[in-house]
Structures are given as structure tokens and as C-alpha cells.
């Protein structure tokens, strides 16, 4: 780690918890003014801020125990000049729980301090104030205050949510002070744990921190969250699809997807579109694009890695194994594809009143280890048809693939010239699609890019533009006012509430859940729970959607722009209302788009 760099995941980690057992205050490390150039004012945590917080509580802290392995984060003199004794107790923390010697030293110095200064708090911090900090505080509660380990862990989690989140720390506590078989599973990781895109998970001394529940043999891998009980497809039972929760297979699949995409961050590596607005719509005139309908489906990447080794990866980076789904090699139908990564979405078609799950493939990143993701998008579409779809159909003709035994069907999703956009939305095509569609996707013809892609544009009718929030229902009131429930809406990477929503009887069940909301009549309105997502939209994404809501590209504007782009490509002069120095022009008469082929 660079000597002047802020610790990974520190920025939006909460500064402090609540006092534990009236004796301890858990907090993250403070950063001195030397780091201000890297930290926005609202995210700073100077030593002086700790002093101001203690004064607001009208409590005195007499001792601060620093568990980190460095002295670079802040000047201890800034602590000591406030009358707080400072002690450095180095704990490794990189995949290692505090040793017995660390624990004995911590308990001894805290006990001695409490005997001499019983009313004063002891502050404890590691880098983030959760695992090493929680471990040692819990050990003290058990050894010196006769608490059960269950009560100690639960109390710390209430004071510093979500508590100790490393499974090996919890197991070690229960091994020392209880029954290791009764150790609880680690809680869901908080959003701030997934915010850095560095490829190395370094802590304060530059060492790599191991991942919970994973093998160190995977090398330079980011910490990946495990969501137990993930649902594959909401509202439909799909036989033959089971979640992968055990190592090493889980980590191997996640790592392979990351490597194939060239993704150095954590979490889902797939390309993510942005909302179309009056600025980025101009990209349609600057580079070649294809268009397809936007299905209201569930995003999945598919890793094909040999016979009975087909896996689906969702936006939470959860992994599912798919049985009885075969992808033969075109040149030899007896062989099975491997080292192949697809991108697409699961949709539910309604056929004769029955729900039929299908996987629509709309991109390919690797084909039998070949980096086809670097090819032109048109080439990739041909690859999907020729190498993925056609060989399956050929083998079905021989009777060697029984489609009725497959958990879901597989199809390729076609893309068209952008001049067909009107027909996709308004023609018979829209009526013939047997699943929900809520807009259009405009795909540039360049190579595949993982993560947020500012040139992949999604257009939705203004009435359907939405944001995925985390809902937190809070009881609020004021002087002369009756307390009432308020729905606070949070987005990723932003500590304060982004917006509010009226709390109804229906909404109460979604407290602390991810909900999709639209903006209607000057207020946010609940649409549905997003069971396929564990995190809200990022702040920048939410702001982009809000911009498209307040300043939307209407269907008429979109059609006009595309018509004029088409005219320009045919050598005709064009001028449209989104160009600078032009006035709003009425929509041109409808043109008959080229047939969809």
C-alpha cells in the first residue's frame, strides 16, 4: 500500500459504533489532515472529531487502544493533548485472529484502567473497527464480566452493526469461549465492504487480507460476499438449478468470470448500461450502434466449463449450478464446450397461460478460451448463433438432447439496426413478445467492457425510469410534533438518506430491503422489491436516473433523433433539437423502418 493512501474500504465505513456495556467505544481508525486531499469533507474523521463527539455525549474517554500495525494514520499527540491515554497494541488482522497473547494483554490493560478510572470509556479501533476490535471487546466481556460468548457477540453487533463479519473470527471466539459448532454464520457484509476496485485487498501494512470462507490458494482475489438462500428466479420453480455455497468451487467460478472479463474489482463483472439522457443520446450519432428490446428479466452471466459444469452468476455474484443443460462443440457434437462465458438474462415467457423460463443470450466474452469479447459486437452475435445455439439444435435433431429434461430453454437475443427502434416499441413486434419489456437497449459495436459502461444506453419511458434504494423505516418526530414512521431511501456510496417515501402498511414489510421506486407526482412511489439484488444503486447511477426523470428523452425525441441520424448517414443534411443553438422542432412524420430480420 502506498504510504499516503487511505485504507481500502475506509471512506464510507461508519466512523464509530455505540458504547458497549458502558465501557468500550468501537470505532474505525481516524485519519489526520494529511489525507484530506483524498477524503471529501463529509467523510473525514480527524482526531478532533472524536473529541467533539465525546463532548456531545457528555462522557469522558480515558484510554484509546490502537490495534493497527502502523502509526501513519494520525498523530497520537492529537489524542494525548485531549487528556486521553494512547496505547498501541499491534494485531496482525490479515486473516489471523488476535493471538492469545494479544487477548491477554488487551484484557489486562483494560482491566487495570477500569480499576483506576471506572467511569471513563475505553476507545478501541483497528482499521475499520469491526473484526479485531469486536474480537477483543467480546473476549473482555466473557473473561472479566462473565458474559456468555453468544451475548457478547450479539451485543457488539447491536452497537457496531453488522458486528464481527469474518467467519474465522467468530469460530475462534466460540472455540475459546463456547462450542465452535454453535458459532453463528457471518452476517451479510455491509455495502462499504465492496466499494474499492483495487485488485489487492490490502490493509494498513500492505499485506493482503484473506477472504472469508475462501482458500488463500486463489491468489490475488477480492473479498466476495456469499448470499445464502439466493433465489434463482422469483415466482417460478426451476428444477435442476441449485446454489453453489461451498469452496473451492464457488471461488473458482467467481474468479474465472472475473479473469475472462478482465475485471479487477469485486462482485458481478458484467457490463452495466447507463440511463439515456439528452447528452449521451448523441453517442448514437458518433459511433455504430445496435438496438434490441429491454426485457424486464433477471441478469445472469453463464459459465460453460465442461459436461455438467454449467453455472449461472447473478448481480449479487451468487453462483448457481445448472444440471441437464448441454452445449456441444459445433465441430464435434460429442464434445462439450468449456472455458466459455456468456452474458444474458432470464425471462419468463407466457405461453398458453404457462410460465416458461428462458435464458436470452445477448453477448459472449469467451468461447472455448478464445477472447471473442475483444471482437466487434456483430461478430460476437454471429458467434452466439453459430457456436452456441446452432450446435444445440443440431444435436436435438439427432435426439441426443431431450429439451423436455432441460431446466430452461436457451435462445439468442437478436439486435437490429437502430432505425428499427420505432417498430420495436410500436409495431406488431412489441405485441408478439411473450414477456414483459420496458424499453430499449442501445449497444455499441465495440469490444465487451466489464462494469459500468457509459456508452451502453438503456432507454425507458419516463414513467418507468426507476431507482433501486435500500429502505430504512425510522421513527421521527420533533418538538410539538407526533412521532411518525418515515421511509428513508439510501443509495450506495452516500451516507445520508438520498430521498424519502411515504410509509404505508404494505411498505413496512420491506424495511432494510432493496426496493425499486419510480418518481410520480413529485414523490417516490414503491414499485416492487428487488429480491435479485442485495445492494442499492450507486449514488452516480441514482443521480443519472434522476436526471433522466427530470429532463427525459421522450419516445418522440428518441425517434426524431434516430430518424435524423439515419438521414445523415444517407448523406442528407440534418439538424435536430438536441443540437446546440437549435429550437425544438415538431416530430417528423413517421417513417417506415426496415423490416426486422
UniProtKB/Swiss-Prot annotation:
Keywords: GTP-binding, Host-virus interaction, Hydrolase, mRNA capping, mRNA processing, Multifunctional enzyme, Nucleotide-binding, Nucleotidyltransferase, Nucleus, Protein phosphatase, Transferase. Residues 1-212 are annotated as: TPase. PROSITE patterns: TYR_PHOSPHATASE_1, TYR_PHOSPHATASE_2, TYR_PHOSPHATASE_DUAL. One of its GO terms (molecular function) is RNA guanylyltransferase activity. Residues 229-597 are annotated as: GTase. Residues 193-204 have a biased composition (Acidic residues). Changing residue 532 to A: Loss of GTase activity. It is found in: Nucleus. Transmembrane segments: none annotated. One of its GO terms (biological process) is 7-methylguanosine mRNA capping. It catalyses: a 5'-end triphospho-ribonucleoside in mRNA + H2O = a 5'-end diphospho-ribonucleoside in mRNA + phosphate + H(+); a 5'-end diphospho-ribonucleoside in mRNA + GTP + H(+) = a 5'-end (5'-triphosphoguanosine)-ribonucleoside in mRNA + diphosphate. Isoform 1 and isoform 4 (at a lesser extent) are expressed in cerebrum, cerebellum, thyroid, lung, heart, liver, kidney, spleen, large intestine, testis, skin and muscle. GO terms for cellular component: nucleoplasm; nucleus. Gene3D superfamilies: 3.30.1490.430, DNA ligase/mRNA capping enzyme (3.30.470.30), Nucleic acid-binding proteins (2.40.50.140), Protein tyrosine phosphatase superfamily (3.90.190.10). The active site is at 126 (phosphocysteine intermediate), 294 (n6-gmp-lysine intermediate). Pfam families: DSPc, mRNA_cap_C, mRNA_cap_enzyme. Residues 330-386 are annotated as: Interaction with POLR2A. Its EC number is 3.6.1.74, 2.7.7.50. Residues 181-220, 570-597 are annotated as: Disordered. GTP binds at residues 299, 315, 343-345, 458-460, 528-533. Isoform 2 to isoform 4 lack mRNA 5'-guanylyltransferase activity due to disruptions of the GTase domain. Interacts with POLR2A (via C-terminus); this enhances guanylyltransferase activity. Binds (via GTase domain) to the elongating phosphorylated form of RNA polymerase II; can form direct interactions with the phosphorylated POLR2A C-terminal domain and indirect interactions via bound RNA. Interacts with SUPT5H and RNMT. Interacts with HIV-1 Tat. In the N-terminal section; belongs to the non-receptor class of the protein-tyrosine phosphatase family. This is mRNA-capping enzyme. It comes from Homo sapiens.
Amino acid at each position: 500500500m502506498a504510504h499516503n493512501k487511505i485504507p481500502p474500504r475506509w471512506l464510507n465505513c461508519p466512523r464509530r459504533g455505540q458504547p458497549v456495556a458502558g465501557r468500550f467505544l468501537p470505532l474505525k481508525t481516524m485519519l489526520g489532515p494529511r489525507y484530506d486531499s483524498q477524503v471529501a469533507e463529509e467523510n473525514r474523521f480527524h482526531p478532533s472529531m472524536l473529541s467533539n463527539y465525546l463532548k456531545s455525549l457528555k462522557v469522558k474517554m480515558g484510554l484509546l487502544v490502537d490495534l493497527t500495525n502502523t502509526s501513519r494514520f494520525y498523530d497520537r499527540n492529537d489524542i494525548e493533548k485531549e487528556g486521553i491515554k494512547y496505547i498501541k497494541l499491534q494485531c496482525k488482522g490479515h486473516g489471523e485472529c488476535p493471538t492469545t497473547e494479544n487477548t491477554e494483554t488487551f484484557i489486562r490493560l483494560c482491566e487495570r484502567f477500569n480499576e483506576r478510572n471506572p467511569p471513563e470509556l475505553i476507545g478501541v479501533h483497528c482499521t475499520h473497527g469491526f473484526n479485531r476490535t469486536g474480537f477483543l471487546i467480546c473476549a473482555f466481556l466473557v473473561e472479566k464480566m462473565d458474559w456468555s460468548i453468544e451475548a457478547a457477540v450479539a451485543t457488539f453487533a447491536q452497537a457496531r452493526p453488522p458486528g464481527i463479519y469474518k467467519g474465522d473470527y467468530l469460530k475462534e471466539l466460540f472455540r475459546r469461549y463456547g462450542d465452535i459448532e454453535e458459532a453463528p454464520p457471518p452476517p451479510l457484509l455491509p455495502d462499504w465492504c465492496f466499494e474499492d476496485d483495487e485488485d489487492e485487498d490490502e490493509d494498513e501494512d500492505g499485506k493482503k487480507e484473506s477472504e472469508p470462507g475462501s482458500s488463500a490458494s486463489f491468489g490475488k482475489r477480492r473479498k466476495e460476499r456469499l448470499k445464502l438462500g439466493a433465489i434463482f428466479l422469483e415466482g417460478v420453480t426451476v428444477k435442476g438449478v441449485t446454489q453453489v455455497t461451498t469452496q473451492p468451487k464457488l471461488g473458482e467460478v467467481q474468479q474465472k468470470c472475473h479473469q475472462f472479463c478482465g475485471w479487477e474489482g469485486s462482485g458481478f463483472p458484467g457490463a452495466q448500461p447507463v440511463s439515456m439522457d439528452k447528452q449521451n443520446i448523441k453517442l448514437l450519432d458518433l459511433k455504430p450502434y445496435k438496438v434490441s428490446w429491454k426485457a424486464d428479466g433477471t441478469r445472469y452471466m453463464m459459465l460453460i466449463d465442461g459436461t455438467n459444469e454449467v453455472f449461472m452468476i447473478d448481480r449479487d455474484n451468487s453462483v448457481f449450478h445448472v444440471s441437464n443443460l448441454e452445449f456441444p462443440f459445433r465441430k464435434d457434437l460429442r464434445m462439450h464446450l468449456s472455458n466459455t462465458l456468456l452474458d444474458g438474462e432470464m425471462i419468463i415467457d407466457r405461453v398458453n397461460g404457462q410460465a416458461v423460463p428462458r435464458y436470452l443470450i445477448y453477448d459472449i466474452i469467451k468461447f472455448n478460451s478464445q477472447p471473442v469479447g475483444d471482437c466487434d459486437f456483430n461478430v460476437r452475435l454471429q458467434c452466439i448463433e453459430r457456436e452456441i445455439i446452432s450446435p444445440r439444435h443440431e444435436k436435438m435433431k439427432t435426439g441426443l438432447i431431450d429439451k423436455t429434461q432441460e431446466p430452461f430453454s436457451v435462445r439468442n437475443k437478436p439486435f437490429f439496426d437502430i432505425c428499427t427502434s420505432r417498430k420495436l416499441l410500436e409495431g406488431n413486434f412489441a405485441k408478439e413478445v411473450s414477456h414483459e419489456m420496458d424499453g430499449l437497449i442501445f449497444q455499441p459495436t465495440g469490444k465487451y467492457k466489464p462494469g459500468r459502461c457509459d456508452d451502453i444506453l438503456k432507454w425507458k419511458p419516463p414513467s418507468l425510469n426507476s431507482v433501486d434504494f435500500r429502505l430504512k423505516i425510522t421513527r421521527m418526530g420533533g418538538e410539538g410534533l407526533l412521532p411518525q414512521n418515515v421511509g428513508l431511501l439510501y443509495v450506495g456510496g452516500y451516507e445520508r438518506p438520498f430521498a424519502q417515501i411515504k410509509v404505508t402498511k404494505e411498505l413496512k414489510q420491506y424495511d432494510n430491503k432493496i426496493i425499486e421506486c419510480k418518481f410520480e407526482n413529485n414523490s417516490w412511489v414503491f414499485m416492487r422489491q428487488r429480491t435479485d439484488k442485495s445492494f442499492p444503486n450507486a449514488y452516480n447511477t441514482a443521480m443519472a436516473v434522476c436526471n433522466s426523470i427530470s429532463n427525459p428523452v421522450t419516445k418522440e425525441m428518441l425517434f426524431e433523433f434516430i430518424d435524423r441520424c439515419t438521414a445523415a448517414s444517407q448523406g442528407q443534411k440534418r439538424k435536430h433539437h438536441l443540437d446546440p443553438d437549435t429550437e425544438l422542432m415538431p416530430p417528423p412524420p413517421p417513417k417506415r423502418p426496415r423490416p426486422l430480420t
